[in-house]
Design a protein with these regions (language model features):
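Cysteine-nucleophile active-site neighborhood
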Residues: 11-75
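Amide-donor transfer/coupling interface in amidating biosynthetic enzymes
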Residues: 71-167
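Glycine-rich, N-terminal phosphate-binding loop of Rossmann-like dinucleotide-binding domains
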Residues: 8
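Short, Asp-centered acidic motifs that coordinate Mg2+ and/or phosphate
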Residues: 3
Length: 167
């Protein structure tokens, strides 16, 4: 195959469950089989973990929008950001973050919430392009995801006090 796109999930990479371990092993396999992997949010967490590097629960989170993502010098020279504004906002929904890049990994962009908003690394002849945010999701869809997850966001995550905080 030429490529694989690995999208988001409501799972958290730092939870050590059989389902998560299976996904990490699955990613390790694909990191040997394809030329390119676009790893979005959860996909980036799985790709970095499969490459043997650290991630953790973020100190804060993105709920709806990742603001002021800033492309760094490495990112400006990377094809992922060709023609993109240096600072931008994007739909985002995450509680995890990469704390150590894979070997020869390059951070391409960051913001106040996540030092690694995007990255690039190669492993086993596979090029991995990782994004912590969700360019594939519209803002309208993000609003519906927040609505769908509101009980969890209030009762478990405690990022909102009540439903009025969400509106």
């Amino acid at each position: 195959y030429d490529g694989l796109i690995w999208g988001g999930s409501s799972l958290n990479i730092y939870n050590d469950t059989p389902e998560i371990r299976k996904q990490i092993e699955f990613m390790k396999n694909w990191q040997k089989k394809v030329k390119n992997i676009l790893a979005i949010c959860w996909g980036m967490q799985v790709a970095v973990t499969a490459a043997g590097k650290k991630k953790k629960k973020a100190n804060t989170s993105h709920i709806g929008i990742a603001k002021e993502i800033e492309i760094n010098r490495n990112g400006l020279n990377h094809p992922l950001y060709k023609g993109k504004n240096i600072k931008f906002n994007s739909p985002a929904f995450n509680f995890d973050e990469v704390v150590k890049l894979p070997e020869k990994g390059i951070c391409l962009a960051s913001n106040k919430v996540n030092k690694v908003q995007s990255l690039y690394f190669e492993i086993n002849q596979t090029k991995v392009w990782g994004l912590q945010y969700h360019p594939e999701i519209t803002y309208e869809k993000m609003v519906s995801l927040i609505e769908f997850r509101k009980k969890k966001l209030i009762e478990i995550r405690k990022v909102f006090k009540n439903e009025n905080d969400i509106d």
